From Swiss-Prot:
Superkingdom, taxonomy of origin: Bacteria
Name under which the protein is recorded: Orotidine 5'-phosphate decarboxylase
Family recorded in the similarity comment: Belongs to the OMP decarboxylase family. Type 1 subfamily.
Subunit structure: Homodimer.
Residues at which substrate binds: 11, 33, 60-69, 123, 185, 194, 214-215
Enzyme class, UniProt record, top EC level: lyase
Keyword Transport: no
NCBIfam families: PRK00230.1, pyrF
This enzyme's EC code(s): 4.1.1.23
GO biological process: 'de novo' pyrimidine nucleobase biosynthetic process; 'de novo' UMP biosynthetic process
Amino acid sequence: MKNNLPIIALDFASAEETLAFLAPFQQEPLFVKVGMELFYQEGPSIVKQLKERNCELFLDLKLHDIPTTVNKAMKRLASLGVDLVNVHAAGGKKMMQAALEGLEEGTPAGKKRPSLIAVTQLTSTSEQIMKDELLIEKSLIDTVVHYSKQAEESGLDGVVCSVHEAKAIYQAVSPSFLTVTPGIRMSEDAANDQVRVATPAIAREKGSSAIVVGRSITKAEDPVKAYKAVRLEWEGIKS
């Protein structure tokens, strides 16, 4: 990760929608996230188009499979020139290590390996869901911290977690370990389907390394204005 800009979640169905959304930003440097919907619709071409626009790019596919499959997939993703990719920590240490090896093998000579982070628990997951549906008796915070330690031991660069776990994670891992936190909303915005949410200011106070912001920007009447407001709050600058 080259900078600390808010990461904009490009939750659109097509390249056409995505590029139309980005047009008002002109050539402003941006850090964007491409998820499953957009990547599965457009494939590697959307990555190429966004890199041509000079965007830093988080490819959010949350790989979770047997180690060999994840290793081979990461080799392919590394060749695309993305900056940040992820796996599910629940896949275990062997899978995470295989993912890292795949990235290292697939990164073109002379290029920097994409950063690799692991999803701990989705921000839509609550304590109740963990206990009743996933049959996990440990608390959510204990599970997230455990997954974070496993990710660091596997050589990964960080994790995806909610803002509310960031401080506890840093009591268990090194200061350079990344905590990428989705579920970010401005105070006036609805939480929608996410449970563990926070504002950019709270994320900064809790020690998040990076924030991922979707609907507060993409659904705003003026996305550029909304992005600037998020960025100022994230940077601790009063508008």
